[in-house]
């Protein structure tokens, strides 16, 4: 598993199996992920905001994303990247979901998440590596979901979910 630790717009650490790797200078987070998929095409890629690294659920992390066609993330915020203020963004708009359980959704988060390199590689020519990592992740999931990629929000990525950044 490759871990990409970031501060919203900048990669600060990359590790593979707890061994540090060189950070690619002058690349934003999505560009870094695309580069990692070229170098490690058979690996899971985990991303995590630096504030939440101490709360990564290492005991369950390997059991959370078990398929090459799955993308999982979790946001500690009640608000998604795409605000409810813009109107209809999802078919389940009138259903109130609990953030305490795993749910299917294309709305991803940069707080923490993971996907197999195959997911990113398949969409590399479709989704451009923009600077806004949340936008990038939501674009990947929104395009990938109808193509058969399972997209989830899973609170078990973190061991402690009661705090706010």
Where do the model's predicted regions map?
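Glycine-rich, basic loop-to-helix element that forms the pyrophosphate-binding segment
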Residues: 25-39
């Amino acid at each position: 598993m490759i871990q990409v630790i970031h501060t919203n717009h900048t990669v600060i650490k990359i590790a593979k199996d707890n061994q540090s790797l060189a950070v690619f200078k002058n690349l934003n987070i999505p560009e870094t992920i695309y580069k990692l998929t070229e170098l490690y095409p058979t690996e899971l890629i985990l991303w995590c905001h630096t504030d939440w690294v101490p709360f990564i659920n290492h005991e369950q992390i390997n059991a959370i994303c078990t398929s090459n066609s799955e993308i999982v993330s979790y946001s500690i915020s009640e608000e998604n990247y795409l605000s409810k203020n813009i109107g209809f963004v999802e078919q389940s708009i009138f259903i109130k979901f609990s953030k305490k359980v795993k749910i299917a959704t294309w709305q991803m988060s940069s707080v923490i998440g993971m996907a197999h390199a195959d997911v990113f590689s398949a969409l590399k020519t479709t989704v451009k590596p923009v600077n806004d990592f949340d936008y990038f992740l939501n674009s990947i999931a929104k395009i990938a979901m109808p193509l058969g990629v399972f997209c989830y929000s899973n609170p078990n990525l973190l061991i402690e979910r009661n705090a706010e950044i």
